[in-house]
């Protein structure tokens, strides 16, 4: 089930509501990444506290460990991990295609060696849909070929055409399995504007309830990613949710919303938190730096997260330096809270028709830097 309601537009920025089997989501939305069924350093209560509306699970990793037999015993991923709100799962394709020296790609699918035990495995659109059906994610993704950013035009066209054939197979398998959830298609085309449009037009025939933009944030220069967003954002169908996969920095989220994107996911806030890199309204802060050793201030005095309301930079500096697990947890709570606040502020700005003003203030504040 998926129902998308577009409430308001301000330029290309959109304010909507997405209704799924496990709940309602206000968009634009950021989805914390729970690769193995957990958002690193966070438990479900932490996620509720920061007002996370939906999380992402990784089909490939969950298929390998703990496997479908285990997760199936719990009725799906929600029951297994103790999370009662919506979940989106990727198709597993990105991870498989990352194993370039361990896989063989054909029209049927991809054969690869398990990086865990060396077993020979095969992933096809049909198998990806079966896995995601067992996971019972609210939003599943079609299996696509993840086109590298540096692909030639001919390589990119050949790749997107196979992804379109896989989109058709994914949709048929999804329907044959009587999956009650939603399946998104994925727009590919590398760094070629006309190929992106060709991919989008090809997907129209399958009438997916939502569309994702894939193949960005895969190593291409930032201006190239933004160029593709400027090209693709305005031509995505207005009545469907738009998902930008694997992006990104706070600035990327704002740029994406400004160009019509509704949904984002990225490991950046959690990964950076574990490395002591914290996001704030006034730029980024490296908590491991010696200047924070005696600093009694919170990470961000304007922040209402648990870490900022209760602990000093000095304590967080100490936790990071000593490798304490609590440090990673508090840093992650802060970074994910910051991302959720950005999204909430953008939703409000679009509602009020003041997105451009909010965007200008956001960039001005971020450029100011922390002290």
From Swiss-Prot:
PANTHER family: QUEUINE TRNA-RIBOSYLTRANSFERASE (PTHR46499:SF1). It comes from Neisseria meningitidis serogroup B (strain ATCC BAA-335 / MC58). InterPro entries: ArchSynthase1/Queuine_TRR (IPR050076), TGT (IPR004803), TGT-like_sf (IPR036511), tRNA_ribo_trans-like (IPR002616). Catalyzes the base-exchange of a guanine (G) residue with the queuine precursor 7-aminomethyl-7-deazaguanine (PreQ1) at position 34 (anticodon wobble position) in tRNAs with GU(N) anticodons (tRNA-Asp, -Asn, -His and -Tyr). Catalysis occurs through a double-displacement mechanism. The nucleophile active site attacks the C1' of nucleotide 34 to detach the guanine base from the RNA, forming a covalent enzyme-RNA intermediate. The proton acceptor active site deprotonates the incoming PreQ1, allowing a nucleophilic attack on the C1' of the ribose to form the product. Pathway: tRNA modification; tRNA-queuosine biosynthesis. It catalyses: 7-aminomethyl-7-carbaguanine + guanosine(34) in tRNA = 7-aminomethyl-7-carbaguanosine(34) in tRNA + guanine. GO terms for molecular function: metal ion binding; tRNA-guanosine(34) queuine transglycosylase activity. One of its GO terms (biological process) is tRNA-guanine transglycosylation. Belongs to the queuine tRNA-ribosyltransferase family. Its EC number is 2.4.2.29. Substrate binds at residues 90-94, 144, 188, 215. Residues 246-252, 270-274 are annotated as: RNA binding. Gene3D superfamilies: Queuine tRNA-ribosyltransferase-like. Its cofactor is Zn(2+). This is Queuine tRNA-ribosyltransferase. It holds the Pfam family TGT. Zn(2+) binds at residues 303, 305, 308, 334.
